[in-house]
Amino acid sequence: PSLPRPEDQPRRMFGIKHPNTVYEFVVLCLDRKTGREIWRKTATKLIPHEGAHGDNNFASASPTTDGERLYCWFGSAGLFCYDLNGKKLWDRKLGQVKMGAYLGEGCSPVIHDGKLVIVRDHQRQSTIEVLNAKTGEPIWKKNRAEGNTWATPVIVRHAGKTQVITTASGKVRSYDLANGDLIWQCAGLTGNAI
């Protein structure tokens, strides 16, 4: 009943564009004083499964380091770990997610005490996952019934527990870094938190 018919718009055609170009996902190391490139590594090359917002790109997350290793998160394209000289140590594909309104995947990874935290809140396919920072092996993963959020989590030690505090749709939640148990949550945010 509501399907478009060509005769309704004889001079126009409509469609949805999907990325069809191979993108190169690059990690750069620059000299802080001069801006000179020290090294450049291609993490992966692929055609993204979805587009990105015009003001954004597929490299939205900030790289994270523990002083020994560099962690680069390109969302559905993968998570890549390098030593500080550019040698790839490991990589993980954490799966593709459908992104809200083509805004991309922009939550940066956080590292604490040998654990790497990745939050992915997109279109109710949402998760929070903790990996071993040295090996990339999973420690725990929790599904989250969330819409879209793009806020990087915060690690806080309180009441004898190390907590991962992160936004959610309409609320803030705290998870136990050791095992992923929900410690507390409170309302007060809107959806699509950044």
Please place each PLM-identified region on the residue numbering.
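Noncatalytic, solvent-exposed loop/strand surfaces
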Residues: 1-194
